[in-house]
Each structure stands twice: as C-alpha cells, then as structure tokens.
C-alpha cells in the first residue's frame, strides 16, 4: 500500500515499525498506518500476503487529550478502598513492614499486569472481548471480566448513594448523627456529646450504640426493620432517590463515550486529592493525631514471618490496581496507537500506591484523635470497610468546629472517588459489548441507557431494609476469586498462547521500543505464578460471608457461588463453542482456536507457531 493512496486531506500520518519475522514460517511484515483527523484515528493494516477480503479502514474515537486518559485511569484505580482498606492492612500487618511485601508484589506482578492490559487494549483497539482475536479460544475471558464489572455495578453504586445521602444530610446546623433524640434511635443509644466520660469499652463495642452507628444502620439502612436476607422489605425512598441521581450522573458522564467521561474526570479524579490534603492538615492538629500516625508507621519486621501478611499484600495489589475488570483495556483502546503505554503504566501505578500510603496519614490522624477522645487503644478504633467512612469518620468530623462544612466536603470526596470508579466499570461493559456487536455500536447511547437502567433495577435490592445483606453477599462473591481467575487466564493467554515475543513486538510497533527482559520474564513466569498463588490462597482461606453477628443461610451462600461461577464459566463455555464451530480435524480446530486471527493464513499453510516448542520457551 502506498502512502499517497491513503492520504486524505490535511491528515497527519505515522508509519509504525514493521514487525519482526515470526519464529516459524515465512517472513511476515505488517504495515500499520495511523492517521488522525479531528481527534479520530484511522488504522489500516495489510500483509505482504493480503487477505482475501478487502482491508477495511476502522474508525475509532480517541481521547481529546492525553491527560483525559491518565485522569480516567487514576480515577478508576484510586477508589474508596484506597481510603478504607490499605491503611488498615498496613497497620494490622506490622505498619511500615507491610510495605516490603506490598511493594515487592507491586513491582513483580502489579505493574507488569497493569502494563500488559494497557498495551493489549491500545494495540488491538477493542474492548475486553475483542482483544482476544490474539487467541480466539480464550475470548470467554473477555466476557468473564465484562460480566464481573456488570455485577460490581449492582452494589458499588449503592456505596455512592450512601455517600450522596450523607452529603445531603450534612447541610444542617446539627448533624443528624451526633444526638440520640431522633426517631430512628434505640433506647440503647448513648450520646457521646452528653458526657465527657468513657465507659471504658472498646469502640468496636461502643459504636454499636453511638449516634453515628445508629444513624448508619437505623437511620440510613433501616436494618432494624429486617430479620435477614430473606426479609428485605421495600426499597427505601431516600436511598432510591440518591441511587437515581447516581445513575443519572453516570449516564450523562458516559453517553458520548470518552469525549464526555474524559471531561468529568477532571473534577472526580482531582477533587479527592484536594480534600485529602485539607483533611490531613486538619487531622494532624487534633489531639492524639500523632499517636495514630505513630501506630500507622510503627515497624514490626517479625510480622513478615507470618503468611497472612504476605497474603494480604498479594490480594491488596491485585484488587487495588483494578486489573482484570476490563477497564484498563477499554480505556487504553481509545489511545493513539503510538502512545507510550509503558510510561503511563509506571505513572499511574506509582500514583495509586502513593495515594494509598498517604491516605493512611489522614485516616490514622483521625483514628488517633478518636482513640484519645474515648480513652481506648488505637486497635479498638482501627477498622476497615464501610464502618470506617460511614461511622467512625462521621463521628470524628462531628466533633470539629464547622462540622457541617467538613462533613459535606468529606462525603463529596467519597462521591467523586466512587463516581469515576463506577464510570470505569460501566465503560468496560459498554465498550466490551459495543465493540463486539455492531448493532449495539450503532446505538451506543441507547445501549448505555439500557446498561445503567439494568444496574439501577438490580441495585434496588441493596437499598431495601435488608439491603446491606444483599450488598455484603455481592461484595463477597461477585469479584473475589472470580476476578483473580480471570486475570490468571488473561496472563496465561497473553504470555503463553499469544507469546511474549509476539506481544513485545506489538509494543515495539506502538512505542518504538521493545520491553526489556525484566518485563518479559514477569509476564511469562512471575505474574502467572503470583496469580496462581493468590487464586489458590483465596480458595483455601475462603470463609462464608457474615454481617456482624448475622450468618447467611445456606441458600444465600449457594446463590453467591452461582454468581461467582457464572462469570468464570464464560471461559470454558466459549472455548467449547469456539472449538466446535471451527472447521476441520481436531488438530486443525485446535490450530485455528489458539492462533491469532491475523495469522489464519499460516494455519491454512500448516505453519502453526503454537505447535512448536520454540514458541513456548521463548522469552
């Protein structure tokens, strides 16, 4: 193809480097011509041995600015768990000593997997399902991560609705969680502001009857009106209204694709850092704050001898970066073809880790303050999960001057932390399916509306009187072992079936530089072994979910496992379908199933790279 034939108007053209020869078979050269006009890239690839059908030029929008992409990735990866989980894990597992396994696993597994997903999406320019043209038999992995992201939307949006409810409740002279004279309070409520003394109980016990705890469980959730998951009751209208607002925000952030979402993240991805800085400056001035920070940073290297510390570090790395949800693939698929995805991976993973670590100073300055206020040890107030941000933090903020303003700012931060992460999850579903089915592509806005409405309807179960039980069940099963399984198969598919050498050649075409031996070894050996370890540990250490003293019935646990296995089942189901639908003998079916679609002509000639030992040994 000559360059002059492809020139249309005042477009800019970039010709990527030609591919290196394949390990087996004749030399194959691919010319990738990238053009850009009005923010839309046109890509066209041809082979020296052209396919039988004419080459089509595919049009795909790109991010308006590079910073839109970076903020979207950072906004997705930095979510509520950075605030409520990492600081607690660090404190629980030896303080500063926990950083040793955390940073080790981040460097040898987290960053390589993050880099892999960015490169995979950017080169193939499709969503989580479409990228598996590199190994058609494993396309089910794409549907696995899409389904998981869909499941997560059922309960994650509810957390944002809680934050929105608290945000609106903050616009009062007296915050509703500081007194026991409200209609939802029980006789056991103990107004902390009516007494300067402490009963000496730990806050894990005391919080069961504090105004903040009762406001969350009785005033917001109305949990006292439910006996369990089999007694949900109707949706609460206040939470339903907040959920509607969340869904509306999500729809209008996503309906035009990255052109709209790329602008929204300028607010949602940056505001949390402004608020965290303000909270840190306020927190360190509180009495007891230094005690909390010392507890957070105290180093106990003997804890590194405990397997649980390494397990916590491994799982935190897996979940904190957001690999395996298809979001990174979807976001990077809208990048320019020549974008430096290696640099993006280093920048965003570093920011994610630094945010997790620095948020610990904010959290523990307030926990130290609460411990001194109640005259109890730090360990009695240190916790993770929703209890930290919806019970402990609100009570701490309520004791400050201008408490209503601080509360509004804090819950606005939670709202923005949640919104851009929820946007990422929905974008994974939308992009993954729109790229796969042309009918949906032609009606993207209508399909986006359908996805957010489906998410809303199923989220209604989580805003009933017993909705916290549904929330806990989904949180436990929807994206636990299943997401780890999906990432494991993804890593094996890219590094082993497609091949590290071929994948590295793809990256060289985009960035002009081939990944060095370190990254190739991580993709080929370290990351798959790490993921296998985490999957096995997650199965061996599995414990049924519970909420406080409530134990879920057997049928609920069975339902949870159905949810978990339904997403994982996409891998064998699609593999079986693909294998059976291919023509030829068993060997020919297998060859077509594991060979990239662009190399089908090699299979026709009997030259299957994956059938050679060299392919599996190359690094």
UniProtKB/Swiss-Prot annotation:
Described purpose of this protein according to its UniProt entry: Mediates sodium- and chloride-dependent transport of dopamine. Also mediates sodium- and chloride-dependent transport of norepinephrine (also known as noradrenaline). Regulator of light-dependent retinal hyaloid vessel regression, downstream of OPN5 signaling.
Q: Describe activation and inhibition of this protein.
A: Inhibited by amphetamine, bupropion, cocaine and ritalin. Inhibited by zinc ions.
Q: Name one GO biological process term.
A: dopamine biosynthetic process
Q: Which residues lie on this side of the membrane: Cytoplasmic?
A: 1-56, 499-515, 583-619
Further notes on this entry?
Answer: This protein is the target of psychomotor stimulants such as amphetamines and cocaine.
Q: Found in which tissues?
A: Found in the substantia nigra and ventral tegmental dopamine neurons, in fibers of the medial forebrain bundle ascending into the striatum, and within dense fiber networks and varicosities in the dorsal and ventral striatum (at protein level). Lower expression in the cortex (at protein level). Absent from the corpus callosum. Expressed throughout the retina at postnatal day 8.
Where does the sequence pass through the membrane?
57-95, 96-127, 128-171, 236-255, 256-286, 306-334, 335-375, 400-441, 442-465, 466-498, 516-541, 553-582
UniProt binding sites for chloride = 316, 320, 356
Which of this chain's residues are annotated to bind Na(+) 2?
A: 77, 79, 82, 320, 352
Indicate what this protein is called per its UniProt record: Sodium-dependent dopamine transporter
Membrane topology note: Multi-pass membrane protein
Query: GO CC annotations?
Result: axon; axon terminus; cell surface; dopaminergic synapse; flotillin complex; neuronal cell body; postsynaptic membrane; presynaptic membrane
Glycosylation: which residues? Answer: 181, 188, 196, 204
Q: Where is this region: Interaction with TGFB1I1?
A: 560-589
Against InterPro entries, the record matches this protein to:
Na/ntran_symport, Na/ntran_symport_dopamine, SNS_sf
Where would you find this protein in the cell? Cell membrane; Cell projection, Neuron projection; Cell projection, Axon
User: Which ranges form a coiled coil?
Assistant: none
Binding positions (dopamine): 79, 149, 153, 319, 421-422
- Which key words are in the record? Cell membrane, Cell projection, Disulfide bond, Glycoprotein, Membrane, Metal-binding, Neurotransmitter transport, Sodium, Symport, Transmembrane, Transmembrane helix, Transport
Q: Where is this site: Contributes to high-affinity binding to cocaine?
A: 105
Query: What is the primary gene name for this protein?
Result: Slc6a3
The record's listing under PROSITE patterns reads: NA_NEUROTRAN_SYMP_1, NA_NEUROTRAN_SYMP_2, NA_NEUROTRAN_SYMP_3
- Reaction it catalyzes: dopamine(out) + chloride(out) + Na(+)(out) = dopamine(in) + chloride(in) + Na(+)(in); (R)-noradrenaline(out) + chloride(out) + Na(+)(out) = (R)-noradrenaline(in) + chloride(in) + Na(+)(in); dopamine(out) + chloride(out) + 2 Na(+)(out) = dopamine(in) + chloride(in) + 2 Na(+)(in)
